[in-house]
Curated annotation (Swiss-Prot):
This is Gag polyprotein. PROSITE patterns: ZF_CCHC. The record marks 125-126, 344-345 as: Cleavage. The gene is gag. Late-budding domains (L domains) are short sequence motifs essential for viral particle budding. They recruit proteins of the host ESCRT machinery (Endosomal Sorting Complex Required for Transport) or ESCRT-associated proteins. Nucleocapsid protein p13 contains one L domain: a PTAP/PSAP motif, which interacts with the UEV domain of TSG101. It holds the Pfam family Gag_p24_C. It comes from Jembrana disease virus (JDV).
């Protein structure tokens, strides 16, 4: 059913018999999105009633005790999915209660028909054994039904401290016994903090995939490579009994790749465990990285990716401050040249100059200028071009002058040394005053 028709049909279904509110396409999209968060694959585009029925059965089998989707949210998701199923199945419910009744009637009828089919098979093949963990769904097709929520939690706890180590590989071998190829990939992608480990595992899987494709050219009777890795197959096709050998092969590939990554991390110093010391020269650190990457079994693209990022992320604080503006994709020559002066006296003097330059900048960002020479970066009292009023030379003030030129003599104040004043007699213009 197309989205436009589905949206019109949803507007005719009320949420409850007592309310006039109707369902919208947003309610269905929300329910599908919540199912995807729980690891259940579903696509609303061109979905069929059988696919929605499988989704409802898988959602009901989940253990939501430790999940935030419980209570009202769980009930709302189930009710919305049942309304969607009833519309895709050709029913026209007026409200959600009628959709629940349609679903119950269909499940009872399917259960009875399934028992009849099982009875016929048992009568024909009385010694037939059921192949678990593949279980039979409501539409009769076998599929895997693992509790991926618990397995995601177990895997997160196993890789929380040390990433993919030997203990995590053992846990991975236990929890992937009942998983399909796509579910194993989802499990690996659930640890973003250990992205380097997962990328190494994926590179080793790609190498095995390439080797199998090469081998397949001379052995056409072997299983298809896409079937082994689960590529291009739906979840129901991956879970069929005919692909049991392919699931086991892919699981073995994943375990072998994870074990190689764990051995590379803990048996010898690998590139992920190499960090630059506080006083270690940057070229020596890069040399260690290159040596470790050369001994690693990975494609050249993966090695180059690790070298570009680890040379920046695992550098010490001083080198990282210089390398971050360049970025991981910068050429190695530029990185070596940028870190050449790190820790030297030239860099320290440069830091001091930048610190003093920041002091001479005003709060509003305007640079101070000297009123004597007009140059920025200092004020008049610190200017080196000011002249001494005593000797006339630049570079110091009169109070700091050490020149003997212009030194004051013992003459009375008001008379400078070097100046000679002649004493002249003054003739009075009037006779002296005589007092009787």
């Amino acid at each position: 059913m197309k989205l436009s028709k589905l949206e019109k049909a949803l507007k005719k279904v009320r949420v409850t018999p007592q309310r006039d509110d109707t369902y919208t396409i947003g309610n269905v999209l929300w329910a599908i999105r919540m199912c995807r968060l729980m690891g259940l694959d579903c696509c609303i585009d061109e979905a069929t009633a059988a696919e929605v029925a499988i989704l409802i059965g898988r959602f009901q089998s989940l253990d939501l005790q430790d999940s935030p989707l419980k209570g009202k949210d769980e009930k709302a998701i189930l009710t919305t999915l049942k309304v969607l199923w009833s519309l895709l199945a050709g029913h026209h419910p007026e409200n959600s209660d009628m959709a629940e009744k349609y679903w119950e009637a269909w499940t009872i009828r399917e259960r009875e028909s399934q028992k009849e089919e099982e009875g016929e098979i048992t009568s024909i093949y009385p010694q037939l054994r059921k192949n678990f963990p593949a279980v039979s769904t409501s539409d009769g097709s076998p599929r895997y039904d693992p509790d991926l929520t618990k397995q995601l939690k177990i895997w997160a706890d196993a890789t929380e401290k040390h990433g993919v180590d030997h203990h995590a590989v053992n846990i991975l071998g236990v929890i992937t016994a009942n998983l399909t190829q796509s579910e194993i990939r989802l499990l690996l992608q659930s640890t973003p903090q250990w992205r380097l480990d997962i990328q190494l595992i994926e590179s080793k899987l790609n190498a095995r995939e390439h080797a199998h494709r090469v081998w397949k050219e001379s052995h056409p009777e072997a299983p298809k490579t896409d079937e082994i890795i689960g590529k291009g197959l739906t979840a129901a096709e991956q879970a069929t009994l005919t692909t049991q050998e392919c699931r086991d092969t892919y699981r073995q590939w994943v375990l072998e790749a994870a074990l190689e990554v764990a051995q590379g991390k803990h048996d010898r110093p690998g590139p992920i465990n190499i960090h630059q010391g506080p006083k270690e020269p940057y070229p020596e650190f890069v040399n260690k990285l290159v040596t470790a990457l050369e001994g690693m079994a990975a494609p050249e693209t993966t090695k180059q990716y690790l070298l570009d990022h680890l040379s920046v992320d695992h550098a010490n604080e001083d080198c990282r401050a210089v390398l971050l503006p360049l970025g991981p994709s910068a050429p190695m020559e530029r990185k070596l040249e940028a870190c050449r002066a790190v820790g030297s006296s030239k860099q320290k003097m440069q830091f001091l100059a930048e610190a003093f330059a920041a002091i001479n900048v005003k709060g509003d960002g305007e640079v101070q200028r000297c009123y004597g020479c007009g140059k920025p970066g200092h004020i008049r009292r610190d200017c080196k071009n000011q002249k001494c009023f005593k000797c006339g030379k630049p570079g110091h003030l009169q109070r700091n002058c050490k020149s003997k030129n212009g030194r004051r003599s013992s003459a009375p104040s008001g008379q400078r040394s070097g100046y000679h004043q002649e004493k002249t007699s003054v003739t009075p213009s009037a006779p002296p005053l005589v007092l009787d």
